[in-house]
Amino acid sequence: MSCSTNKVLVLGGARSGKSRFAEQLARQRSQQHDAKCHYVATAVPFDQEMAERIYHHQTQRGQGWCEHEAPLYLAERLSQFGADDVVLVDCLTVWLNNWLFEFGEHASNEKLEQKVAQLASVVKESPAQIILVSNEVGLGVVPLGQISRLFVDNAGRMNQSLAQRCDNVTLIAAGLPLVLKSSGHQ
């Protein structure tokens, strides 16, 4: 399979329509290239509300996906895909948050940046078509708590790093796509 643009970053706020947009793009690419469509989930159902969110995404997505879970070791999971795969990762900010809690009181910019750098390297080198979904969390006020600032700052840097490595970057607001970076193909 050959596709001149095989890395896409889809950004948006909560319930903005970013997952739906990314799912449609993944299905379209899978059909165009007769490729296997993979969904890599990063969320863990740690409470009832999160379990309901996960269920909502699963039912909205429908059949035909090879599903994988990677709440922490996302780079390792992505390195397993090849040129015949279309891979949708939903969502990077949940993944970053998982690492923040995994590190606990030892969480730091350096540790989170190391995980993001590892992920960005794998995304750049992967032969697979990868569609990444992430929350744009930097449009609000600066959070008051240290852990919240650590998360927001690192999420912003993560999105910048991955946007540099992706061929296309789209911001979804109110269900509408706004192209931020384009290689000419979506």
Give, region by region, the residue ranges found by the protein language model:
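Short, basic/glycine-rich phosphate-binding loops at helix/coil junctions
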Residues: S4, A51, Y55-Q58, D90-F103, ...
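SAM-dependent methyltransferases
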Residues: M1-T5, V86-V89, Q114-L119
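Helix-adjacent hinge/juxtasegments
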Residues: Q63-K111
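Charged, low-complexity C-terminal accessory regions
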Residues: M1-K18, Q28, D34, V40, ...
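Residue-level signal for inorganic ion chemistry
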Residues: A22, H57, L88, N135, ...
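Generic beta-sheet signal
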Residues: V8-V10, C37, D85-C91, A128-L132
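Conserved P-loop
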Residues: N6-F81
